[in-house]
From Swiss-Prot:
Belongs to the universal ribosomal protein uL2 family. NCBIfam families: PRK09612.1. Pfam families: Ribosomal_L2_C. The gene is rpl2. Part of the 50S ribosomal subunit. Forms a bridge to the 30S subunit in the 70S ribosome. It comes from Thermoplasma acidophilum (strain ATCC 25905 / DSM 1728 / JCM 9062 / NBRC 15155 / AMRC-C165). This is Large ribosomal subunit protein uL2. One of its GO terms (biological process) is cytoplasmic translation. Residues 219-233 have a biased composition (Basic residues). One of the primary rRNA binding proteins. Required for association of the 30S and 50S subunits to form the 70S ribosome, for tRNA binding and peptide bond formation. It has been suggested to have peptidyltransferase activity; this is somewhat controversial. Makes several contacts with the 16S rRNA in the 70S ribosome. The keyword Transmembrane helix does not apply.
């Protein structure tokens, strides 16, 4: 009898594949309307961008994804305002064309889903019935004008520039994100461990395409691929 492949083990939810949520500081969403002061810039396990520890005018503590140029003691504003200074959180309808924004809501009130990792930002292209943004992938996407976003660019844009010189450092980095630190090819395994394993030399030995509705133990390789088009046909 064959053994469970990695996606099946991950779906079972053991401690190896479970996110270490006990190390996470908090779930970072948009802050409530008001004026805040940056008290500290802290590292957040599981994230590649730092967090801003904010203190509101009402004395409540809040957290926000840090932006480039933030400093301790800086005042930032959140709400339905027309300010264009970095760190301001407001609705897309108030943000002028050509501005850089991050932590963009997909639907009004969800707290932010787009452009949250280090160094990312989106460009406000145009306003109309919808607000058009150019995402880091180059894709143009329309958003509801009531969706909120924060002006600026996410901090720590150069976090991936220095090389990771030690394998152990990379292991700890990926484990904080509940990711496997290494990948073993299926053709390099034994037949008991993977559908592509076994044989006198490394080869799949059968068509590597599988259907979209294949059972989990067989769903490896090229998943429901589309026929390659030649000359647009």
């Amino acid at each position: 009898m064959g053994k469970h492949i990695i996606p099946q083990r991950r779906g079972h939810g053991s401690l190896v594949y479970r996110s270490p949520s006990h190390r996470h500081i908090t779930e970072v969403k948009h802050v409530d309307q008001g004026t805040y002061v940056i008290k500290d810039i802290i590292h957040a396990p599981g994230r590649n961008a730092p967090l801003l520890e904010l203190m509101g005018s009402d004395g409540k503590k809040a957290y926000q994804i840090a932006f480039t140029g933030a400093f301790v003691g800086q005042n930032i504003v959140a709400g339905n305002v027309d300010s264009v200074s970095p760190g301001t959180t407001t609705v897309l309808a108030n943000i002028p064309d050509g501005s850089y924004v991050y932590n963009i809501e997909s639907s009004p009130g969800d707290g932010g889903e787009f452009c949250r990792s280090a160094g990312t930002f989106a460009l406000v292209v145009s306003h109309g019935q919808h607000v058009t943004l150019k995402l880091p992938s180059g894709r143009m996407r329309d958003f509801d004008p009531r969706c909120r976003a924060t002006l600026g660019v996410v901090a720590a844009s150069g976090i991936k520039d220095p090389p990771i010189l030690k394998a152990g450092t990379h292991v700890h980095y990926l484990r904080s994100k509940a990711k496997r630190p290494y990948t073993v090819r299926g053709v390099a395994m034994n037949a008991v461990n993977h559908p592509h394993g076994g044989g006198n030399h490394q080869h799949v030995g059968r068509p590597s395409t599988v259907g979209r509705n294949a059972p989990p133990g067989r769903k490896v390789g090229r998943l429901s691929p589309k026929r390659r088009r030649v000359n647009g046909r």
